[in-house]
Amino acid sequence: MVSLEVRLRTPKGKREAKRLRRRGEVPAVVYGPATDPIPVKIKRSLLEKVFHTITETTPIRLVIKDDEERTVSEKTVFLKMIQRDKVSEAIVHVDFYEPVKGHRMRINVPLKVVGKPVGVEKGGFLEVYHEEIPVETDPDRVPQEIEVDVSSLDLGDVIHARDLKLPEGVKCLLEDEEAVVSILVPKEVSIEEEEVEEEVAEPEVIKRKEEEEEE
């Protein structure tokens, strides 16, 4: 489990948030069904360091300290939302979510596509409709990713939400018929198939005419 150290902060509006950012700190908040919002701040350098190793499904051990470096509390949280500056793309705010043990939570799990589809080798295109899969699960059963093998998919084949293999206790929140990935048929392939069908059908018509003339 990834550990992250944060400090308590007193919210004082946008000016204070800007001052924090100038000092290399990022304002954040911790909340949950049984947790009142806790304003905290975190060093940007520390956040950037761990940001590339965590996702929305990564449990984080959050160590909350006061200004005197005393540990106030420790919580197991998940990264709920990251806000970035529109121009610089620097992180400007973070939301941490603390679930309630024993109560199910909703979370988006990354979809991992593995294998090279048969249909792609025939000229088709792999289309992924959902990069993440919304699920409902217990906090201690959150999967890091949902893997789907597309090796056997041919032209026109589709994997629906109902086809996903999920761990025990994890429920997909997509409709059963929702398409997750598919192999699109390129127009060139469709046109060639139609031309072949027409060429095959033509001799049959000629043969029938010859039979009628013989009669």
UniProtKB/Swiss-Prot annotation:
A single GO BP: translation
Classification via InterPro entries: Rbsml_bL25/Gln-tRNA_synth_N, Ribosomal_bL25/Gln-tRNA_synth, Ribosomal_bL25_b-dom, Ribosomal_bL25_C, Ribosomal_bL25_long, Ribosomal_L25_dom, Ribosomal_uL5_bac-type
Record-level Gene Ontology MF annotations: 5S rRNA binding; structural constituent of ribosome
Gene3D superfamilies, alphabetized: Ribosomal protein L25, beta domain (2.170.120.20), Ribosomal Protein L25, Chain P (2.40.240.10)
Pfam families in alphabetical order: Ribosomal_L25p, Ribosomal_TL5_C
Chain intervals for the UniProt region annotation (Disordered): 192-215
UniProt entry tagged with the keyword RNA-binding: yes
Keywords carried by this UniProt record: Ribonucleoprotein, Ribosomal protein, RNA-binding, rRNA-binding
Composition-biased stretches (Acidic residues): 192-202
Gene Ontology CC annotation, any one: cytosolic large ribosomal subunit
Compositional bias ranges of the Basic and acidic residues kind: 204-215
NCBIfam families for the chain: bL25_bact_ctc
Subunit structure: Part of the 50S ribosomal subunit; part of the 5S rRNA/L5/L18/L25 subcomplex. Contacts the 5S rRNA. Binds to the 5S rRNA independently of L5 and L18.
Family listed: Belongs to the bacterial ribosomal protein bL25 family. CTC subfamily.
Alphabetical list of PANTHER family matching this protein: RIBOSOMAL PROTEIN L25/GLN-TRNA SYNTHETASE, ANTI-CODON-BINDING DOMAIN-CONTAINING PROTEIN, RIBOSOMAL PROTEIN L25_GLN-TRNA SYNTHETASE, ANTI-CODON-BINDING DOMAIN-CONTAINING PROTEIN
Function: This is one of the proteins that binds to the 5S RNA in the ribosome where it forms part of the central protuberance.
Protein name, per record: Large ribosomal subunit protein bL25
